[in-house]
């Protein structure tokens, strides 16, 4: 039921903010001023696991968290994240406090077995693209259903880019399905033991891809200089 998503308690550490509901544990981690990690695991006793990608900020930077009766707000100089306490849905705003993206308030996420669905409220007119393997390769996924994972061959996260000035990088080594068809979602489904994605705020597409490549390649690949 929808009541399962109600936020019951909140814990802030130096690296992240955790919000717990009857459905599971949501963690918001500022990675850089432009990049926010959103992780979720189903179950009241479960913990967010480490992945092959960046789990927290490498370099300390300024961000703050505050709480009102209805909201939890986490802000860097570039991004403000608001989580509604009554449903656990996450909304992202740019530095001008303009809404860029919202998870669906009715049911923000669903987890069954190793399949994780995140439901988003994309605007009807919003143009969305998925990054391909080549630098200039972008596939239009507006109002379509497409597999956007690299089939396990490439050690990179699937990346969705919006003309509104943000990107979504999905932290899954398994299958990732993007569905922009309103009748069925819209949603992103990713395989894994937890739901994990990175929100990137940047208007310029080249810069956004640069941030994605610099910040969000696999830890051991960046250390070895592969990317």
Predicted features along the sequence, with ranges:
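Hydrophobic/aromatic beta-strand elements that line small-molecule binding cavities or substrate pockets
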Residues: 25-28, 157
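A low-complexity, Ser/Thr/Gly/Pro-enriched, surface-exposed linker/loop concept
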Residues: 1-10, 14, 29-72, 108-113
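Extended Gly/Ser/Thr-rich low-complexity repeat segments
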Residues: 27-34, 47-57, 82-96, 224
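Catalytic and substrate-binding clefts that recognize carbohydrates or anionic sugar/phosphate headgroups
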Residues: 20-21, 66-225
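Noncatalytic nucleic-acid binding interfaces
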Residues: 1, 21-22
């Amino acid at each position: 039921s929808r009541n399962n998503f109600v936020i019951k308690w909140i814990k802030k550490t130096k690296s992240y903010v955790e919000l717990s509901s009857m459905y599971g544990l949501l963690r918001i981690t500022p990675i850089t001023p432009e990049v926010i990690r959103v992780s979720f695991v189903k179950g009241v006793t479960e913990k967010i696991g480490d992945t092959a990608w960046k789990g927290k900020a490498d370099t300390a930077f300024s961000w703050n968290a505050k709480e009102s009766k209805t909201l939890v707000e986490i802000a860097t100089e570039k991004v403000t994240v608001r989580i509604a306490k009554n449903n656990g849905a996450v909304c992202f705003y740019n530095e001008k406090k303009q809404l860029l993206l919202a998870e669906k308030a009715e049911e923000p996420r669903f987890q069954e077995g190793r399949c994780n669905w995140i439901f988003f409220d994309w605007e009807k007119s919003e143009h969305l693209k998925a990054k391909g393997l080549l630098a200039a390769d972008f596939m239009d996924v507006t109002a379509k259903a497409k597999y956007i994972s690299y089939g396990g061959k490439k050690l990179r996260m699937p990346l969705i880019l919006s003309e509104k000035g943000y990107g979504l990088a999905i932290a899954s080594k398994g299958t990732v399905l993007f569905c922009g068809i309103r009748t069925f979602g819209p949603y992103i489904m990713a395989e894994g033991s937890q739901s994990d994605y990175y929100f990137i705020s940047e208007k310029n597409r080249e810069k956004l891809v640069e941030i994605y490549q610099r910040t969000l390649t696999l830890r051991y690949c960046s250390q070895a200089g592969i990317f």
